[in-house]
Amino acid sequence: MKKNILTTLVAALVYFLCIGVGVLLGNLVDHTGNMFYAPAFSALVGGSVYMILLAKVPRFGAITSIGLVIALFFLGSKHGAGAFLPGIICGLVADGIGHLGHYKDKVKNLLSFLVFAFGTTGPILLMWLTPQAYIATLIARGKSQDYIDRIMVAPNPANILLFITSVLIGALLGALIGQALSKKLAHKTS
């Protein structure tokens, strides 16, 4: 039990670092400063951590814990009321999907990660669902009007489709890489 908790905490820390790498990669693709591509790149980079955690700790709660860490980050970093909700909701739902397959079913684990990847979308969703509140949060954090104008992404159908598609592609690739790496690590230890 103690080993599972430690493994989960380490995975949460490493996944959090993957989110940071995802933000950096997103900024390389889009120089506006918004986080539009960060969830997709975070999923691409974090898929391996997720799949290895499922192999090492095949119990309900591990994935929920990482979702909670993501949620607490968004809550603590003042991204706006509600930005933390996707982390909690996606973490719980993803954990439930993985649990249905006893964390051994490749397809359910893949679906689980596709859902989990949307846990980092809170700030973008808030920008689209409550733009005035999102702008007020940015102003309260000391952001200039120029910055705000640059990072706001209109919630038109093309942008929404691009956002969802990019997250799904990043998550799919991240999960497949993660499953291959997890399998390789399992063969090395046996």
Regions found by a protein language model. Give the residues of each.
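Aromatic-anchored segments of alpha-helical transmembrane domains
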Residues: 15-21, 69-77, 116-125
